[in-house]
């Protein structure tokens, strides 16, 4: 297109010759190269510039948000310009890392809370495919109301219009945000009028359930999933609100150990007719390195923890709010240095664009529903792969060579060419994965530039077992494999004897063992002369995470124990039963000791009130550093945050199981435990634990009393991981159930009823311990 003229005034140019445009979307970020040059009357070029540009439409149809005529969901996060070393001066490398991590986690939207970003970031969002809720620098915070003061009207309008003028040519901008927490904000009416003169995209304001004319979307912050006495809940807006699409501008407050029940939010959202999605608060913890240490080049302590500081490091007067709000700046789903967390694993799973369901173990078939708005699932851009595991060990890794293209918004059934034969002696699981492929066709944008070839962008796990491993939970359902059943045990050789409160013997390898009790409590356990425990099992209901702030919780980790059936030989075995009584729960433990050194510990819990956790704590002896576990992993997961964590066999160390959340708190849970193997490589001894029934576990070198702060609830208590004392013994939890995390550190759900520990009934698991020599064991941390 060529235009001529001599006018120096503003001129509008219409490109009438463009047709058959390839539209831009976050799924297919196709960009054109636009070259603009200025020539003189002799056709000599005076100046020129080149830019990337994408074409898309954004419209509202009733209560739906449409991009290029198709309904899309906002799978978003709120972001901040923050860097642990540079503070608010975020560099390009970190911005790029953020965008790539978000794409890998199926995040498709960034809300620039609460100010526009530097232009480089919009170019990245255009190129990699990320929708942007572009927010003006108008933030009053919480109970402030400057935007209703007419004296601020001109300044506010100026900020809004400058944002639109600067960023209107970026296809990534989905809609505009007038600002944040400015009250009724009457000044926004005139601002919206001026903004619409320059761009037609929707305009939004976080109007806290108020039906305001200057917002094209309805919005509020931190709703619960379902209605409560003081919160209308997301489900109440399934059809939109006030005739507008409903957008959750902030939800799932991710402070500390968090992001519970995200799946339930999205079950409601994706089944709605008027909810467009939401943005998690927020992307990254905003702590920085301790400046005093940073100037000396010190970023990590001797025990390997980062020298991160938080709001309470800048409060000089205890209990006085000086604007720093304790730990309240650390609400990220990644850490300050952008480390992937268990929280992000959950987000990736819940946000994924593919649903796997209706798996048939006999037919080896699975239904795949394509939830992309535009992108087909075809052999040009994806590979459908699978991995078969036997008791957690990989036994087959394959792919589907030919499959029919699955159109956007459509389902199809796919046959997996699984070759593994299953039997009734093991648990067989299959992980089905959708893996990205680099495009090879011309005129196709490289939508995978953020990922390596073969990256699994969506997945699910199903049971292949013929064995009934379930105790009532339906097997073969995505993410719910049921709980393991321990077969009856027969000792293979060995001998034992009982003397008073001690059972001792020799196993089938000639190794001696001894277990002693006092008043029903295990006091010592040795194998081949080596200590296995530092403290025996006892009831423990204590937990402390940011989302528990609404609970006043003192430390509770002991019970009164009495012997109900004394230690005695019974045939070739020995048995003993004890009863324990603790606040809110009584329990019984039935011990069975086998000649080969195996010990069964069958525990039945009878709670009388709803607790944070129902389970036992114990301490393993120093040296048991190497860990292999068959449970959900590899990262920590909880009862309402395990959708993105699959059963598998993982190796690590106790030290590496720490979740380095900024403020120390309960960490490291792994749900649906089948087997745990602890190895002391120094002394050549190994202790295996197999599980029957429901159980989760965690391991730590840190005594949790170090972060038990009673009623302070982590707002002002100054505490860091590098302040804690690392003990040599291993603190272990074996829980029948731990309360779900919820997301109540700032509004939202405390814990949904499905994830609350029961306050009545009886609940049983069995732990089967087996010590053995480990001279040849060589477990490597991964």
Can you annotate each of these PLM segments?
Residues 1-61, 422-424, 428-442, 447-480, ...:
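Extended acidic/polar, glycine-enriched regions
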Residues 1-11, 365-402, 413-416, 425-437:
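Beta-strand-rich binding/interaction modules
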Residues 22, 31, 45-109, 114-117, ...:
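An acidic-aromatic substrate-binding cleft motif
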Residues 25, 417-425, 440, 465-782:
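Beta-strand/loop-rich accessory regions of lumenal/periplasmic or secreted enzymes
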Residues 28-30, 377-384, 611-614:
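Short coil-to-beta strand junction motifs in C2/discoidin
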Residues 45-367, 371-378, 385-396:
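Extended substrate-binding grooves/exosites of carbohydrate-active enzymes
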Residues 1, 11-13, 34, 49-51, ...:
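Hydrophobic residues positioned within well-ordered beta-strands of beta-sheet architectures
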Residues 184-187, 254-275, 402-467:
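Repeat-solenoid scaffold signature
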């Amino acid at each position: 297109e060529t235009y001529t003229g001599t006018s120096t005034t503003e001129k509008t140019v219409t490109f009438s010759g463009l047709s058959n445009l390839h539209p831009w979307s976050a799924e297919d970020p196709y960009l054109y190269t636009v070259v603009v040059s200025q020539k003189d009357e002799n056709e000599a070029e005076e100046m020129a510039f080149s830019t990337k540009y994408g074409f898309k439409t954004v419209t509202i149809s009733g209560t739906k948000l449409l991009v290029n005529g198709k309904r899309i969901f906002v799978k978003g996060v709120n972001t901040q310009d923050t860097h642990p070393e540079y503070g608010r001066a975020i560099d390009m490398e970190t911005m790029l890392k953020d965008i790539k991590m978000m794409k890998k986690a199926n995040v498709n939207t960034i809300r620039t809370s609460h100010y526009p970003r530097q232009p480089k970031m919009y170019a990245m969002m255009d190129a990699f495919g990320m929708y942007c809720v572009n927010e003006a620098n108008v933030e009053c915070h919480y109970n402030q109301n400057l935007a209703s003061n007419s004296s601020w009207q001109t300044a506010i309008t100026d900020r809004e219009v400058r944002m639109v003028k600067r960023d209107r040519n970026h296809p990534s901008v989905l809609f505009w945000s007038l600002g944040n927490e400015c009250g009724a904000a009457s000044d926004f009416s005139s601002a919206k009028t001026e903004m619409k003169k320059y761009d037609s995209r929707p305009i939004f304001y976080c109007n806290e359930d108020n039906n305001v004319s200057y917002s094209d979307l309805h919005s509020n912050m931190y709703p619960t999933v379902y209605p409560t006495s003081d919160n209308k809940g997301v489900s109440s807006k399934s059809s939109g609100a006030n005739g507008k699409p409903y957008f959750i501008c902030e939800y799932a407050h991710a402070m500390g150990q968090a992001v519970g029940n995200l799946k339930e939010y999205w079950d409601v959202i994706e089944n709605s007719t008027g909810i467009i999605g939401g943005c998690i608060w927020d992307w990254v913890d905003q702590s920085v390195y301790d400046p005093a240490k940073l100037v000396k080049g010190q970023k990590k302590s001797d025990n390997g923890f980062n020298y991160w500081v938080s709001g309470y490091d800048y409060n000089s007067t205890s209990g006085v709010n000086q604007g720093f709000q304790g730990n309240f700046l650390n609400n990220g789903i990644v850490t300050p240095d952008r480390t992937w967390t268990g929280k992000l694993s959950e987000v990736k799973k819940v946000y994924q664009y593919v649903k796997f369901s209706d798996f048939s173990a006999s037919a080896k078939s699975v239904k795949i529903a394509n939830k992309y708005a535009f992108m087909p699932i075809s052999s040009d851009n994806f590979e459908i792969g699978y991995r078969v595991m036997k008791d957690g060990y990989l036994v087959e890794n394959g792919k589907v060579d030919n499959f029919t293209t699955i159109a956007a918004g459509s389902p199809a059934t796919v046959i997996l060419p699984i070759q593994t034969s299953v039997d009734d002696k093991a648990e067989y699981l299959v992980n089905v994965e959708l893996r990205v492929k680099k495009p090879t066709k011309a005129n196709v944008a490289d939508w995978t530039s953020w990922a390596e070839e073969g990256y699994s962008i969506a997945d699910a796990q199903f049971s292949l077992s013929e064995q009934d491993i379930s105790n009532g939970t339906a097997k073969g359902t995505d993410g719910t494999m049921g709980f393991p059943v321990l077969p009856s045990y027969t000792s293979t050789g060995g001998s034992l004897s009982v003397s008073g409160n001690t059972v001792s013997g020799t196993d089938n390898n000639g190794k001696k063992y001894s277990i002693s009790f006092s008043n029903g409590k295990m006091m010592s356990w040795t194998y081949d002369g080596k200590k296995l425990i530092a403290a025996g099992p006892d009831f423990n209901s204590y937990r402390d995470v940011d989302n528990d702030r609404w609970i006043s919780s003192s430390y509770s980790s002991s019970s009164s124990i009495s012997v109900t059936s004394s230690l005695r030989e019974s045939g070739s075995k020995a048995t003993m039963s004890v009863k324990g009584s603790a606040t809110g729960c009584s329990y019984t433990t039935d011990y069975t000791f086998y000649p080969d050194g195996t010990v069964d510990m069958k525990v039945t819990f009878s709670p009388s009130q709803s607790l944070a956790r129902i389970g036992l704590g114990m301490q393993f002896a120093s040296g048991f550093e190497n860990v292999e576990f068959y449970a959900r992993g590899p990262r920590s997961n909880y009862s309402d945050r395990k959708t993105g964590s699959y059963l598998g066999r993982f190796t690590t160390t106790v030290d590496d199981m720490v979740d380095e959340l900024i403020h120390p708190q309960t960490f490291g849970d792994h749900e649906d435990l089948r087997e745990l193997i602890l190895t002391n490589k120094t002394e050549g001894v190994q202790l295996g634990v197999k599980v029957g029934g429901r159980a989760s576990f965690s391991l730590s070198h840190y005594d949790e009393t170090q972060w038990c702060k009673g009623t302070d609830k982590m707002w002002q208590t100054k505490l860091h991981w590098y302040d804690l004392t690392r003990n040599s013994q291993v603190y272990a939890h074996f829980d029948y159930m731990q309360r779900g995390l919820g997301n109540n550190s700032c509004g939202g759900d405390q814990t949904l009823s499905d994830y609350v520990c029961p306050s009545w009934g009886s609940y049983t698991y069995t732990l089967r311990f087996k010590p053995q020599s480990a001279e040849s064991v060589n477990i490597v941390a991964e």
